[in-house]
Amino acid sequence: MTSYYVYYRVDPARVETVRLAVQALFDAIERETGVRGVWMRRRDEATTFMEVYDNVADERAFEAALSRESAALGLERKTERFICA
């Protein structure tokens, strides 16, 4: 199965707004795909955040849902995909 790592920067003034939007994103993604994300912040840098989604079985459906649901965040996002070695 595939794990997705989506990272981006957030203006410090928008962190709480983005936090609420990310929770709504996680709820929608979980409803549609059964995959629950985790929101993380870079340890040594307060403006870099990451969404982690593990054990994605249906990549096509997940990517479609992620693209659709994340558009509302209005952030430039970078997505990386990893599989178990």
Each language-model region and where it sits:
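Short S/T/G/P-rich N-terminal loop/turn motif that feeds into the first structured element of a domain
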Residues: 1-67, 76-85
